[in-house]
């Protein structure tokens, strides 16, 4: 776990969520000193924001796909 001000750009949603869950467990169980807990909390905020961004991107992509799927062209046969 790195406590940088930014996350690695290539961290997946699943990896970020797993790390966030581990941080929450450690803080809830009081397994860390106050200073370490504060650093973990800061990292947790970065992870939460990253997860929210990934979810928003996925939602927008799904909406775009759905719009494309719903706007298919239907050809009707006409008599000539």
From Swiss-Prot:
BP term (GO), one: DNA catabolic process
Keywords: Cytoplasm, Exonuclease, Hydrolase, Nuclease
Reactions listed under catalytic activity: Exonucleolytic cleavage in either 5'- to 3'- or 3'- to 5'-direction to yield nucleoside 5'-phosphates
Main location (coarse class): cytoplasm
Subcellular location: Cytoplasm
First and last residue of the signal peptide: none
One cellular component term from this protein's GO annotations in UniProt: cytosol
Known EC number: 3.1.11.6
Enzyme class: hydrolase
Family in the record: Belongs to the XseB family.
Subunit structure: Heterooligomer composed of large and small subunits.
Protein name: Exodeoxyribonuclease 7 small subunit
Originating species: Rickettsia massiliae (strain Mtu5)
């Amino acid at each position: 776990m790195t406590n940088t001000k930014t996350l690695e750009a290539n961290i997946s949603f699943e990896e970020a969520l797993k790390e966030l869950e581990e941080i929450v467990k450690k803080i809830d169980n009081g397994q860390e000193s106050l200073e370490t807990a504060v650093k973990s909390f800061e990292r947790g905020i970065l992870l939460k924001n990253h997860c929210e961004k990934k979810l928003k991107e996925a939602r927008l992509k799904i909406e775009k796909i759905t719009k494309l799927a719903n706007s298919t062209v239907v050809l009707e046969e006409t008599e000539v």
